[in-house]
Amino acid sequence: MINLSTPSDKLLEEIETDLGKLTWWLNKVKGPNVRSNKRKELARKYRAQWAQERKRFIGETLEYKSALGNRWFCYDVVQKPAGAADIMVGVDKFIYWETLGSIGAFLPQWWTDAETMTNHPSCLIYTSHFFQRFAERAKIPFRSREMVMAFVSELNFKPYKEDTDKDGNPILVFRMNHTGFAYAVRRKDNPLVIEVRTYLDETNMTPSKLKRYEELAQRIEADGFEDDTAWLGFIHAAQAGEALGY
C-alpha cells in the first residue's frame, strides 16, 4: 500500500502500476469512448450551470481497489478558462488522492531528458500535513468533500518561485489562490519527486515574508491563473474508510 515514507523509486513504481490498471478498469466500466462521452456530458451540465462563470465542476464518483491494496475514488472534473463563454479547454492530466492511514494527492508526470530523449517518471505529492493546514486555514472540515472541492478549485501545478528554507535547503513555492501559498521540497533520494508539505495564507505570514512574495502575488494577479489551471480529466482519490462523506 502507498505510504509517503516509501522510497521514491518504489513509490513511483507502485503509482505507475496502479495508474495503468486503473485506466484499464475505467475503460472497462465506462467503455472505450469514456473520454468522448464524458466530455459531451460534462459540457452539457457545465454550460447549463456555469455558462458565464469560471468554476470547476465535479461529477459522479467511482471507487476502485487495486491488487496492491490502494483504494481510489475517481471524480470527473472540468474547468472553463476566463473569456471562453461555452468552450472547455483542458489537458489529459490525472491527480491521485490517496488515504491509507494518511491522506495525500498525487500528480504523476513524465520528465523528458532533452539530451538523451529518454523519459523519467516524476511525481508531485500533496502530503497529509498540507491538507491539515489547508483545511484549518480555510476553516473547512478535514477529510470532507468540501475540502476536496476547495482543493480542486484552487489547484495550481506550476511552481512560480524557488526559494530556500531556514536551513538553506531549496524549496518550491506554489501560489494556490490569491491569498495563500503552498510550500514544497524535492526529495533528496530523487529530485523528480516533489512533496508539497504545508500551506500558508497571508494572515499566517510575517511582514517580511509577505513583502518577499508581493511580486509573486502581483504576477499571479496579472496572469489571472491562465497558465496551468485550465484542464479536464479524472481526479482519482484513495481512502481507507468512508468515501469522503458519502
Protein language model regions, located:
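Ribonuclease/tRNase effector modules and their secretory precursors
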Residues: 1-246
